[in-house]
């Protein structure tokens, strides 16, 4: 181990870094340098043991954690001068890694090309739209309950995901004696059939399909075991049964599996996680085989804060019937550091209501006037839920008194003025809405009051203002048209949305100045979210234009179902992964949200809480007879375990000052509750003379350096064509209006990819005309079903001809193919460069790059500008291939599949100087994007005719850059 490692790591960290043979359990207490240890262990494997990137698998809890790990490892390797392409590693969440396995081996799964991936809302909406299918099943209400259709779909989702995440054997369910479990079995069987019918996959089933792949295809498992030499898993205490089984399969005989976590911070039982995975990890191996390391030195918190949460855990009950459900550990500060003796754990309390909020406000002002607090973002409030009425009231009170609050998960999306005005605008544009929303004369939904009073009324009031007369003038003919629509329009709801953005009522939120405000452009982000919701709605309900035959139903579906369900469930607002504590704002976060973070000042609320039961009768039935393993933690005790772990996690986020706050309430539900009361009142009051923030030092919030990915086609070309388009659709993440996809080109590409895949597998003899047509038809059926676009028979015949011509021309040279559809990436100093190469072929020590174009070969003179852009794209790919593989690229080609009889190639010689200029230009564009420079010298009018944001741009007051 090099001196650089030794000087930075403590004894236990070094032990964890250097132990690479066999299973390793790292129990990492809060603030103990867990991420540092993970980074150094990866670097050690690469530099000292010469492990190749494709031999490493690293699982993180979030994609953000994966990006942070990639960034930190690449920076360390750069420090010591080691070139290594980290993106060859299997690194990411369980879901992303399993998805990669499925895509790499899709032919061995039930999945077909172009499958749909559901998020949680998509999954529930899918079930909601089919709830009547489930109501036909015997005893379905034992699973779904007897609530509304939406409530039943929510219950159904919960139980279906539990079956999947617990890896419960469907055959065991099918043979159940309990009526509830029989009903669940029928629901599960139906759901799996529906997923297969729609070629869909939800998040839980990503892992189930991956497990099924590994268990049913020994050749796939053997290949992965032979490839993956070292496995590392972060946050192991929050893994579930199916994830544990996947790891057990992948680790193979060498068992070089390193798991890292803290059983005291296991928070995700409600998502299927089980603490038994980390507590029983050593038992998976022969006695003495698993090497345990405990990281217990806390580099984050003041010793008094550490002592407070140590005592909190020591007071919990962790042993039941002789079995212990916690690793014994005591967190301690570094021995060689000096700390001040001022109180660092204090309380804020006052009677419930305004008095408590005033007291919290006074405390914050004391911190501010102390002169030691440099930014409000050094303060974070942590609660069980930020949707709680007391929490929402406190946030509003503080904002009204000049303290900005950042609370992206408080579900205030539908309370924001810009969202309410948008909904009001849509109601205004469809005068029939008050009548068509009713399914009978006496019908009423609670959300109609929100629409009428909170959305329509304020929008109507805005229209009375002189500055909004252009908006009224634009709307009036549309109101008339929509009220008596006789012919299909040439737009849908999303088209109206982008028209609305041209008016100052909404455009004011999109200017560069608004995005630099304290709230970091929250309103603009909310408008972007609304565009995504409309896009999703139109896709789910097959809407491409407003059609008089379906308009009334579309309005009911949008307002009575889609928006209502989103309103009831709540929508989080924008969160920037690279800035978890925005400057100028006090953070209001859930404890779960704060996991893994740290703040100089942490104020923990929700002290009126107590342990609460989190399981149902059906949970108990499944636990005691149907799970793959016997019960572990006693169900009756889980509420206490979870309660102690939750607040331990909260308390341990604090660096310099930990504050406990509670309103005071008597009666049968006292606040603070009995679980906190003694500890709470034993703390010094913040008004005590002993509390002297003037004498304290508050750290600054740590910056997070996350490298972002950039590709030539998705980023550089878009930015160069129009920086304003880039700002909208990439930076602010607006969703463009759905247009008919280029089905022809995609179909040709996918079928050629099928050909290459078989050839690379050594089965070129299978590439017959009949087989190619079979692949082609299967691809077309899947594409057409997903995109809801169909091709005429003559067009289909032409597309098949493109593929057949390619096969006939190239079949004698299949042996030159080395790789196909290669997603390649390169971690650079400032960003990650990515690309996707259609084909890499080679001979005599060099390789050539081929990019397919499903069109006729263009006129080389007339299309010179377009061909030059393609050449730059190929040069980026050549740079990626050479840097990633070390192979020399000799030539680059465009292959035009539509060329009937002539040469289908347009070829470019590789020139190192030209490539260097292209990469330098790429770097310059990325630098502009990274610093938020979207200025233009003029509008690129050739891009405007079909652009969704043209109405906005036509009315924008431009500030063009001066040409050099």
Please give the residue ranges for each predicted region.
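Accessory C-terminal helicase-associated subdomains
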Residues: 181, 200, 372, 468-593, ...
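Conserved helicase NTPase motor core
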Residues: 2, 7-18, 22-26, 37, ...
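P-loop NTPase Walker
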Residues: 1-111, 198, 219-222, 231, ...
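Conserved P-loop NTPase-based nucleic-acid remodeling module centered on helicase motor cores
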Residues: 55-151, 276-280, 727-728, 743-747
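Helicase P-loop NTPase motor core
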Residues: 35-38, 53, 287-291, 297-403, ...
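C-terminal accessory regions
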Residues: 462-465, 583, 615, 626-681, ...
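Conserved helicase core region in the C-terminal RecA-like lobe
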Residues: 90-100, 232-235, 260, 565-617, ...
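ATPase/helicase motor core of nucleic-acid motors
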Residues: 97, 284-287, 342-343, 369-508, ...
């Amino acid at each position: 181990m090099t001196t650089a490692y030794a000087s930075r790591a403590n004894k236990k960290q070094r032990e964890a870094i250097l132990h690479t043979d066999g299973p390793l359990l790292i129990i990492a207490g809060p603030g103990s340098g867990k991420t540092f240890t993970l980074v150094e262990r990866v670097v050690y494997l690469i530099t000292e043991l010469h492990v190749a990137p494709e031999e490493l698998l690293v699982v993180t809890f979030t994609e953000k954690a994966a990006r942070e790990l990639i960034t930190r490892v690449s920076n360390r390797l750069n420090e010591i001068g080691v070139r290594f392409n980290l993106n060859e590693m299997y690194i990411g969440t369980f879901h992303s890694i399993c998805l990669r396995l499925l895509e790499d081996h899709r032919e061995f799964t039930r999945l077909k090309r172009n499958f749909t991936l559901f998020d949680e809302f998509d999954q529930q909406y899918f079930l909601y739209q089919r709830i009547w299918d489930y109501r036909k099943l015997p005893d379905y209400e034992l699973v779904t309950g007897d609530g509304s259709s939406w409530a039943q779909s929510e219950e159904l989702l919960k139980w279906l995901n539990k079956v999947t995440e617990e890896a419960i054997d469907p055959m065991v369910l099918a043979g159940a004696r309990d009526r509830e479990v029989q009903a669940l079995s029928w629901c599960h069987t139906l759901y799996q059939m529906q997923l297969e019918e729609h070629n869909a996959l939800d998040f839980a089933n990503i892992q189930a399909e991956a497990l099924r792949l590994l268990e049913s295809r020994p050749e796939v498992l053997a290949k992965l075991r032979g490839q993956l030499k070292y496995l590392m898993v972060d946050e192991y205490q929050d893994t579930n049964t199916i994830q544990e089984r996947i790891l057990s399969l992948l680790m193979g005989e060498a068992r070089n599996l390193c798991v890292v976590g803290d059983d005291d911070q296991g928070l995700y039982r409600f998502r299927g996680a089980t603490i038994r995975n980390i507590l029983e990890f050593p038992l998976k191996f022969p006695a003495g085989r698993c090497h345990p390391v405990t990281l217990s030195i806390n580099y984050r918190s003041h010793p008094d804060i550490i002592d407070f949460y140590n005592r909190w855990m020591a007071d919990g009950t962790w042993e039941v019937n002789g079995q212990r459900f916690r690793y014994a550990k005591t967190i301690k500060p570094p021995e060689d550091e000096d700390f001040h003796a001022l109180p660092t754990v204090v309380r804020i309390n006052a009677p419930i209501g305004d008095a408590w909020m005033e007291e919290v406000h006074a405390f914050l002002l004391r911190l501010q006037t102390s002169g030691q607090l440099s930014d409000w973002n050094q303060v974070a409030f942590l609660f069980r839920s930020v949707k709680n009425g007391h929490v929402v009231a406190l946030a509003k009170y503080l904002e009204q008194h000049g303290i900005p609050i950042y609370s992206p998960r408080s579900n205030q999306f539908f309370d924001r003025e810009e969202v309410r005005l948008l909904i009001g605008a849509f109601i205004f544009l469809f005068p029939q809405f008050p009548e068509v929303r009713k399914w009978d004369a006496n019908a009423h939904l609670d959300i109609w009051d929100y629409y009428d009073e909170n959305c329509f009324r304020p929008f109507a009031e805005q229209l009375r203002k002189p500055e909004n007369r252009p908006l009224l003038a634009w709307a009036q003919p549309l109101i008339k048209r929509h009220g008596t629509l006789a012919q299909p329009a040439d737009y849908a709801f999303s088209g109206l949305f982008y028209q609305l953005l041209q008016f100052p009522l909404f455009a004011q939120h999109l200017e560069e100045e608004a995005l630099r405000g304290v709230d970091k452009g929250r309103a603009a982000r909310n408008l972007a979210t609304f565009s995504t919701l409309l896009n999703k709605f139109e896709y789910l309900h097959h809407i491409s234009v407003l059609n008089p035959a379906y308009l009334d139903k579309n309005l009911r579906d949008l307002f009575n179902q889609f928006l209502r369900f989103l309103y009831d469930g709540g929508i989080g607002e924008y969160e920037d992964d690279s800035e978890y504590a925005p400057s100028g704002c006090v953070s209001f976060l859930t404890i779960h949200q704060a996991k893994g973070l740290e703040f100089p000042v942490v104020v923990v609320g929700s002290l009126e809480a107590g342990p609460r039961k989190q399981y149902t009768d059906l949970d108990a039935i499944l636990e005691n007879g149907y799970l793959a393993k016997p019960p572990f933690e006693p169900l009756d005790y889980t509420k206490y375990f979870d309660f102690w772990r939750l607040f331990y996690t909260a308390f341990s986020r604090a660096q310099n000052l930990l504050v406990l706050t509670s309103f005071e309430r008597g009666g049968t539900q006292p606040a603070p509750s009995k679980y906190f009361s003694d500890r709470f009142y034993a703390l010094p009051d913040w008004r005590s003379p002993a509390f002297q923030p003037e004498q304290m030092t508050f750290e600054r919030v740590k910056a997070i350096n996350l490298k972002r990915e950039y590709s030539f086609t998705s980023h550089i070309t878009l930015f160069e064509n129009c920086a304003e388009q880039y700002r909208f659709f990439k930076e602010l993440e607006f969703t463009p209006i759905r247009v008919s996809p280029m089905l022809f080109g995609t179909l040709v590409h996918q079928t050629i990819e099928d050909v290459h895949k078989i050839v690379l597998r050594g089965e070129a003899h299978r590439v017959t005309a009949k087989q190619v047509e079979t692949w082609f038809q299967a691809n077309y059926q899947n594409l057409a079903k997903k995109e809801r676009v169909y091709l005429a028979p003559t067009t289909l015949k032409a597309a098949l001809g493109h593929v057949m011509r390619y096969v006939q021309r190239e079949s004698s040279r299949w042996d030159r193919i080395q790789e196909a559809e290669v997603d390649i990436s390169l971690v650079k100093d400032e960003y990650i460069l990515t690309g996707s190469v259609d084909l890499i072929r080679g001979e005599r020590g060099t390789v050539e790059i081929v990019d397919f174009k499903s069109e006729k070969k263009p006129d080389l003179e007339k299309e010179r500008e377009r061909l030059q852009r393609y050449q730059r794209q190929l040069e980026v790919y050549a740079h990626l291939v050479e840097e990633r593989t070390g192979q020399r690229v000799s030539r680059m080609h465009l292959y035009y599949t539509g060329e009937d009889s002539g040469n289908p190639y347009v070829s470019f010689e590789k020139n190192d100087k030209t490539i260097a200029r292209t990469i330098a230009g790429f770097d310059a564009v990325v630098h502009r994007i990274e610093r938020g420079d979207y200025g233009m010298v003029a509008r690129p009018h050739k891009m405007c005719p079909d652009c969704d944001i043209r109405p906005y741009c036509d009315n924008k007051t431009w500030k063009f850059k001066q040409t050099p």
